[in-house]
Amino acid sequence: MPVNCSSCEERRAVLRRPKTGHSLCKDCFFHAFEEEIHHTIVSAKLFNPGEKVGIGASGGKDSTVLAHVLKVLNERYAYGLDLILVSVDEGISGYRDDSLETVKRNQQQYELPLKIVSYQELYGWTMDQIVKQVGLKNNCTFCGVFRRQALDRGAMMLGVNKICTGHNADDIAETVLMNFLRGDIARLRRCTSITTGSEGAIPRCKPLKYAYEKEIVLYAYFKKLDYFSTECIYSPNAYRGHARAFLKDLEAIRPSSIMDIIHSGENLSVKEDVRMPVQGTCTRCGYISSQSLCKACVLLEGLNRGLPKLGIGKHHKLHHKLLSQEPLSEQEERKLKAVDF
C-alpha cells in the first residue's frame, strides 16, 4: 500500500531514510539532506565568506555529492565561497584513469575549475609501479600517505584556504573502530574532528561528517548524479574492509550504531589540553611532520633505494642515516628488503 511523505503529507514517499526512519518523497528528502549539511556547515563554522575552498574530487559518490551540494548551498545561502575541484591521479591503470574522466565531466556539469596532480609528477612513481615493488599487503600505506600530501600540494598550488573531503559518517565510524582495534587512541581526536588544521599544510573539513553512506547513495541516485562506482583494484586486502564489514553487521541490528560509534570516539579522544607531539617541518621537502623526515619522504627513500619496508613500521633510528646519506648495514638492508606479497 502506497505511503504518503511524512513531511509534506501530499506526495507519495519513495524512500525510508536509513538515518531517521522517516518515509519521504524525493523533494522532501533532497531538502532534508541538504539542510542537514547546511546545519553542519553553519554550526561548525566551517567557512568564512570570500574563502577559496578546494573540494577533494575522486569521481566517487561521496566527492560528487559533496561538490554538488556545496555548489547548491553556496548559491542558496550566499556563502560567498570560491569553489574548485582538486583531484589526485595515483597512476592506477583501469581505475583512476576512468574515474578522472568522471571528474572532468563533473567539472563541466558544475562549472567549477579543476586541478589534477599526479604521483608521477610529485614523486616519480605511480601506484602501479609501487605495487610491483611492495606487493598488496602494505600498498594502502604508501597510497594513503602520498595521496594526503598530494592533495595538500595541489591545494597549495591553487592558493586555497581550506580543503573539503567527502568523508561521511560511515567512514568516520570505520576509522574509530580501526583505531580502537589497533589501540591507537591518540588518533581519535583527528578522525572524529570535523576540522583538522595541525595535521596538514591547509585546514581540512568534512561537511558530510553526519551523512550516512546509504543516504549519500540515495541522493546521488535520485538526483541522477554522474559518479564512478568501481572500488580500487588494490584495496581488497585493506584493513578498513574488515572494520566496514563489522560496521554493516552492527548497523543491520541497530541503525544508530554509526552515530553511536562516532560519539564514543569523540568522548574518548585525547583532550585539547593534553600535550601531543610537536609538529615541525620535514628537513627534506618542508612538509609538516613530527619527525625530521616526513612519512612520504621516508617511504619514497625506501622505494628509490629498493628498501620497501623502510617506511613500514618504526624505523626512526635510521632517519639520521638517510639524512646524511650513510650506507645501511647488511642486516638493516636485508630486513628492509623483505616484503610479504
From Swiss-Prot:
EC nos: 2.7.7.-
GO biological process: protein urmylation; tRNA thio-modification; tRNA wobble uridine modification
UniProt GO molecular function: nucleotidyltransferase activity; tRNA binding
Subcellular location, record wording: Cytoplasm
Keyword Transferase appears in the UniProt entry: yes
Record's GO cellular component terms: cytosol
PANTHER family: ATPASES OF THE PP SUPERFAMILY-RELATED, CYTOPLASMIC TRNA 2-THIOLATION PROTEIN 1
Similarity field: Belongs to the TtcA family. CTU1/NCS6/ATPBD3 subfamily.
Biological function: Plays a central role in 2-thiolation of mcm(5)S(2)U at tRNA wobble positions of tRNA(Lys), tRNA(Glu) and tRNA(Gln). Directly binds tRNAs and probably acts by catalyzing adenylation of tRNAs, an intermediate required for 2-thiolation. It is unclear whether it acts as a sulfurtransferase that transfers sulfur from thiocarboxylated urm1 onto the uridine of tRNAs at wobble position.
Protein name as annotated: Cytoplasmic tRNA 2-thiolation protein 1
Species of provenance: Xenopus tropicalis
Gene of this entry: ctu1
